[in-house]
Amino acid sequence: MKKCFVVMGFGEKPDYATGRTLDLDKTYRTIIKRAVEEAGLECIRADTVIHSGTIDTPMYQLLLEADVVVADLSTSNANAIYELGVRHALRPHTTIVIAEKQFKFPFDLGHLLILPYEHLGKGIEFEEVERMRAALVTAIKTLVEKPATDSPVYTFLPALQPPSTAPAPVVQGFAAAVDGLVA
């Protein structure tokens, strides 16, 4: 099954640009996870990855190997913006950026296509959840079927070749061990 790695903050986080607090877990549960699964992909967020040690190794591996990455930049989370940059350096396509409508994006992100949604802070209206979920399903299916360059790195450096996405042996062994425990 194809995989989608979700880049975003967790829990309730302050949006310092607007002074609001956004429940990012609600965005994940009601919009992103549902859309990814409806599009037929496995949805993975860093806080759901079983690992030993630091999250860095599986995070970098997922940024490289995921068939699709959805990055929610709503609260200008530095980690999410950094991970988006890493993804853009590693893969030329299949990266989707979303953000709450009041998101004040940094200048360097101004050229990206960012799918907006309206967040009310603690919640999201049902109609908005359904609208954004449908838009995200369409975006995911379109990118999986017809990948187009969405990375500024590969747009401006067209001769650049992405690294191999063959799974690392250590992580393959770890995944096999986890599968053995679950089975």
Regions flagged by a language model, labelled:
Residues 60, 73-142:
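Cross-kingdom TIR/SEFIR domain
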Residues 1-51, 62-66:
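Conserved N-terminal substructure of TIR/SEFIR domains
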Residues 61-63, 95-109, 150-167:
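A short, terminal or domain-edge coil/loop segment
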Residues 113-183:
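C-terminal interaction surface of TIR/SEFIR-family domains
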Residues 54-59:
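Short acidic active-site motifs
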